[in-house]
């Protein structure tokens, strides 16, 4: 099972630093080092790996087939490369529909992990306005299978530009 919070993977370094500096906490410099170490433990250490997102989408597809879910979701079929962030945000919102419709613990865990991974990578992209992109509600409603296929296509657009 992957760690749900990849940015906490390197916290052991800060723990060792704290142990090393334990005798120096009585000084002002030691306290500053301790505080900075604690702050850095909470900062993101790695970017989301889009390949994990694709693997999670394939797992969701398999799980949905086993529970025979047939909802329709707003799906971006042919997103322009300049609209990929907007399209990704729509896909992430529609994942919540799958979550609500399935009421499956395994799907819940995978969607939470996938959302966290994707959002951590999206947060590193500049906040630029994507003009001319469709709103989520303007997209065509398609089956879950088509939704997941299009979602993988959008993720691959992010892989190809990184």
Curated annotation (Swiss-Prot):
Residues 1-29 form the signal peptide. Keywords: Cytokine, Disulfide bond, Glycoprotein, Secreted, Signal. Coiled coil: none annotated. Residues 30-48 form a propeptide. Its main location: secreted. Pfam families: IL15. It is found in: Secreted. Disulfide bonds join 83-133, 90-136. One of its GO terms (cellular component) is extracellular space. GO terms for molecular function: cytokine activity; cytokine receptor binding. Glycans are attached at residues 113, 121, 127. InterPro entries: 4_helix_cytokine-like_core, IL-15, IL-15/IL-21_fam, IL-15_mml. The keyword Signal applies. It comes from the Eukaryota. One of its GO terms (biological process) is positive regulation of immune response. PANTHER family: INTERLEUKIN-15, INTERLEUKIN-15-RELATED. Belongs to the IL-15/IL-21 family. Cytokine that plays a major role in the development of inflammatory and protective immune responses to microbial invaders and parasites by modulating immune cells of both the innate and adaptive immune systems. Stimulates the proliferation of natural killer cells, T-cells and B-cells and promotes the secretion of several cytokines. In monocytes, induces the production of IL8 and monocyte chemotactic protein 1/CCL2, two chemokines that attract neutrophils and monocytes respectively to sites of infection. This is Interleukin-15. The gene is IL15.
């Amino acid at each position: 099972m992957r760690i749900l919070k990849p940015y906490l993977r390197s916290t052991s370094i800060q723990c060792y630093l704290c142990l090393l500096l334990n005798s120096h906490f009585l000084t002002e410099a030691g306290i500053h080092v301790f505080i900075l170490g604690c702050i850095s433990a909470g900062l993101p250490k790695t970017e989301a790996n889009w390949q994990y997102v694709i693997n999670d989408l394939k797992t969701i597809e398999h799980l949905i087939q086993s529970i025979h879910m047939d909802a329709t979701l707003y799906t971006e079929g042919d997103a322009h490369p300049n609209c990929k962030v907007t399209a990704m945000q729509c896909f992430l919102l529609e994942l919540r529909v799958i979550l609500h419709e399935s009421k499956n613990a395994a799907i819940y865990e995978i969607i939470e992990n996938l959302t966290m991974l994707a959002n951590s990578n999206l947060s590193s992209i500049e906040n630029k306005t994507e003009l001319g992109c469709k709103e989520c509600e303007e997209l065509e409603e398609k089956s879950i299978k088509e939704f997941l296929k299009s979602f993988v296509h959008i993720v691959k657009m992010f892989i190809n530009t990184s």
